[in-house]
């Protein structure tokens, strides 16, 4: 029986297209990876031939060029939001992801705390990351988002956010789960 999806071809084509896009954009490409990078059993069920770790395998082909930025909402840290599939909080999942990525030779450049709110839980999380050498950046709530475009693009909107410094040509943005 022929499978409906050629995983090897996918990996080869996707990584080649990403390399081409990096070259097109002056050697800097930002990609958001939604969904699971590890254990994507849903995708492998609905696309026979797609392997549960296909996205990760594709990233590994680009690991010398790739830098990962993990994003987590301050609200998810404060509320101790739990992943339904793993039963762990989002902040613990960020730590798990860092270990997993680094264990595979991928570079985690930083963690960005979005919707930043000063709270002991958030500051303890940032301190924990900084103490193990992971840089953290803060992005703030923007009043009027997404409708007040003038405010959003002002110094009090996006301009208030800390600039996330990156060093590699491919910046992969991911999160511990939906909504973060």
Placement of each model-derived feature along the sequence:
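Long, basic/Gly/Ser/Thr-rich N-terminal segments
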Residues: 1-145
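Glycine-rich phosphate-binding P-loop
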Residues: 168-179
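Short, glycine/acidic-rich beta->alpha junctions
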Residues: 51, 121, 164, 178-179
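Short amphipathic alpha-helical segments, especially helix-boundary/capping motifs
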Residues: 100-104, 160-165
